[in-house]
């Protein structure tokens, strides 16, 4: 039996928040491992959003499903983007943190648009989200 997509999105959000809380707790700095895990989680959310956009554009998923699932993905990505904007890290990891935070903002914005996008827009969003997923790896 497959795991429902909403459960996967909720688990991903909980995992990302736990990692950021652990990494940033008590005024500490975000570790390289936590930053890499955050990028991996965002990459997964972007890839899932891209597949959702492709299916929506091809008429393989309903507009309601696309809207609801993209909202779940958006919430997870928006929370990660917010946390990354506030995060601190070592100077050596600063560029990676800024890049990951910028991509998190973009993924979040794309996922928010996806829920109400036309099929043409969904095709463009699929390309953008796949590119973001690849860049986050």
Segments from the language model and where they lie:
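Short, exposed beta-strand-loop hairpins at the edges of beta-sheets
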Residues: 116-124
């Amino acid at each position: 039996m497959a795991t429902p997509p909403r459960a996967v999105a909720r688990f991903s959000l909980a995992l990302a928040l736990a990692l950021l809380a652990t990494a940033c707790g008590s005024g500490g700095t975000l570790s390289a491992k936590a930053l890499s895990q955050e990028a991996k989680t965002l990459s997964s959310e972007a890839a899932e959003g891209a597949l959702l956009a492709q299916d929506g554009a091809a008429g393989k998923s309903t507009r309601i499903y696309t809207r609801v699932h993209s909202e779940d993905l958006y919430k997870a990505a928006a929370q990660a983007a917010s946390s990354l904007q506030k995060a601190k890290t070592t100077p050596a990891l600063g560029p990676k943190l800024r890049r990951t935070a910028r991509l998190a903002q973009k993924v979040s914005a794309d996922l928010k648009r996806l829920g109400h996008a036309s099929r043409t827009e969904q095709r463009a969003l699929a390309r953008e989200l796949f590119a973001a997923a690849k860049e986050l790896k």
